[in-house]
Amino acid sequence: MKNKRKGRLPISTAVVVLVILCAGILLIESQTKIIRRWIDDVIYDNQNHYLACEQLPSISEVEKVLEEHRDMVDQIEAINPGFVGVEVHPCGNGNADITFWYDSHQDRIMIEQIIGNDTFFGVPYNLHNR
């Protein structure tokens, strides 16, 4: 007597479905960085812009923006002196972004409230908990 297994997928079909599902997840992640953003935010308490170096402004433009808005930079650094800071972060081809670093999640929240935007006056920035 044959042992019929109705309603069960053959192993090869299950493997194909799994491979397609994984490929779809990888494609979505490569375009949106949704998993990486979640890990950065929830686990590391960081926020990154994920732009390529070629998409960033020149180092001189970044330094000019920081100088023009020195009052806001001072306000950010005053959140927790010695434990909050601002750096120009060059990426190697003459372009740069800004990194705001901080000691606690509360510091990060205050930095985000002061900046109030996805860029610092047009310059992409990262938030790093150190």
Q: Where are the regions that the model predicts?
A:
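N-terminal Lys/Arg-rich, disordered targeting/topogenic segments
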Residues: 1-7
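Short amphipathic alpha-helix segments
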Residues: 60-83
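Short proline/glycine- and acidic-rich turn/helix-capping motifs at secondary-structure junctions
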Residues: 56-61, 123-130
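N-terminal presequence-like segments and adjacent domain-start helices
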Residues: 26-67
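Generic surface-pattern signal
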Residues: 40, 44, 74, 78-81, ...
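Hydrophobic membrane-insertion alpha-helices, especially the h-region
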Residues: 11-30
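Short glycine/threonine-rich beta-strand-turn micro-motifs
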Residues: 45-53, 80-107
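Short amphipathic alpha-helices in soluble, non-transmembrane regions
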Residues: 108-118
